[in-house]
Amino acid sequence: MAVTVAVGTSNPIKYRAVLRAFSRYYDVRVVMVSVDSGVGPQPSGVADVVGGALARAVRAVEKADSYFGVGVEAGPIEFPASGGYVETQVAAIVDRDCRATIGMSPSFEVDRRVLALMLDGVEMEKAVGVERHGGLGESVGFVGVATSGAVTRQDLTEHAVIMALIPRLMGYGSIATVEEIAAQAGASVECRSTRAI
């Protein structure tokens, strides 16, 4: 029997990345669920990026009554780099018991001028000036343009989801709750168990 996974997005790139990642390990049925992340269109900082991913995952698992909910957010997070931040994708996987695992994609530095705009809430493709490519967020992403297609947004998202699956695949004995991870990130996200009693 297939495991149902709800992705908290209406973005087909995120959907395909989650489908590819989960299909490596599970017989899976993936559904898209439109949810609010609780953060702006360009999240920045660990609290917003991790909090947004967790919120998407929680709302997806609750709304779809699925086995897993997956949330993905991208944005600059604090890290030792030229501008003090790197752009990354964070994936959160939440189960019916409100246990959460987190994974990150490969990350890259962002030009300081672009970073300043992103930290003010301007979406990356607009801040970089590549909006003329149209719909980058739902295609190769800025990373696809920057790497001439060697790495795409779907690749980054898929890798983040696979990283978030590791504790579940390896059977880690203790998986944190949504609230525990949110608190570590400086965010506030609540989850209520959807497991039938």
UniProtKB/Swiss-Prot annotation:
Pfam families named in the record: NTPase_I-T
Top enzyme class: hydrolase
Cofactor binding description: Binds 1 divalent metal cation per subunit; can use either Mg(2+) or Mn(2+).
PANTHER family: NON-CANONICAL PURINE NTP PHOSPHATASE_PRRC1 DOMAIN-CONTAINING PROTEIN, PTHR34699
Family per record: Belongs to the YjjX NTPase family.
Task performed by this protein: Phosphatase that hydrolyzes non-canonical purine nucleotides such as XTP and ITP to their respective diphosphate derivatives. Probably excludes non-canonical purines from DNA/RNA precursor pool, thus preventing their incorporation into DNA/RNA and avoiding chromosomal lesions.
Protein name per UniProt: Probable inosine/xanthosine triphosphatase
Organism: Aeropyrum pernix (strain ATCC 700893 / DSM 11879 / JCM 9820 / NBRC 100138 / K1)
